């Protein structure tokens, strides 16, 4: 019986610790036409983080991002040198999830094909850095 209790306690602890690990995922309309646009969505499960954090996405040449009003979850938005950048000096504490949405325009001259778009969510807690990769694939037709 003692072994059963210890096994149950270890399993409960492992599940509890797993639940406290932040996660992030980036998604987009899978297909876009050159000259068109699509919405990029970033879902971040920040758990109980309330620290400095940032999200970055490096767009290919010919792609340009603009902020969608009201969809930045209190982050500062920048787009420069093909890089989308959201920055929080302190993540919102009211909830455990954050959602970002921004518009991506694809210029007429972009070649047809698949584009792997790298990105990441990074945060700092007690002088330790954490980073979660958030790649996404978009096909230009």
Question: PLM ranges: what are they?
Answer:
Residues 2-10:
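Sec-dependent signal peptide recognition
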Residues 91-113:
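Low-complexity, intrinsically disordered segments enriched in Ser/Thr together with acidic residues
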Residues 19-33, 77-79:
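Low-complexity, acidic Ser/Thr/Pro/Gly-rich terminal tails and inter-domain linkers that flank the onset
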Residues 10-18:
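Hydrophobic h-region of N-terminal signal peptides that target proteins for export
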Residues 52-91, 134-136:
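A surface/secretory-pathway sequence property marking extracellular, secreted
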Residues 45-50, 58-62, 107-109:
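Short solvent-exposed strand-capping/beta-turn motif centered on an Asx-Ser/Thr pair
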Residues 105-136:
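Serine/threonine-enriched low-complexity regions used as flexible
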Residues 30-51:
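Short beta-strand elements of extracellular/lumenal beta-sandwich folds
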